Structure formats: structure tokens, C-alpha cells
Amino acid sequence: GLYCCQPKPNGQMMCNRWCEINSRCCGRR
């Protein structure tokens, strides 16, 4: 399935494009 936020190896979170378009993710608007 699709997850809004996924952890990168460096510990930061990355946001899927679907989430960025359709929802809020990782504090982005």
C-alpha cells in the first residue's frame, strides 16, 4: 500500500507524491 511518510536511511522522512497532492504529509502543505 501507499504510505504518506517513509523514513529515509539518514533518518529524515520522505513524502510520497500522492500524499503531497491529496493530503498533508510531514508538515508540508
Curated annotation (Swiss-Prot):
List-wise, which residues carry Cysteine amide?
Answer: 26
Any one GO CC term of this protein is: extracellular region
Tell me the superkingdom of the source. Answer: Eukaryota
Write one Gene Ontology MF term.
toxin activity
Q: Which cysteines are joined by disulfide bonds?
A: 4-19, 5-25, 15-26
Tissue expression profile of the protein? Expressed by the venom duct.
Compartments (UniProt record): Secreted
Q: Which UniProt keywords apply?
A: Amidation, Disulfide bond, Ion channel impairing toxin, Neurotoxin, Secreted, Toxin
Does this UniProt record's set of keywords contain Membrane? no
Instruction: Report the domain remarks.
Output: The cysteine framework is III (CC-C-C-CC).
Annotated family: Belongs to the conotoxin M superfamily.
Name of the protein described by the UniProt record: Conotoxin Bu17
- Which species is the source of this protein? Conus bullatus
Q: What is the lineage of its organism?
A: Eukaryota, Metazoa, Spiralia, Lophotrochozoa, Mollusca
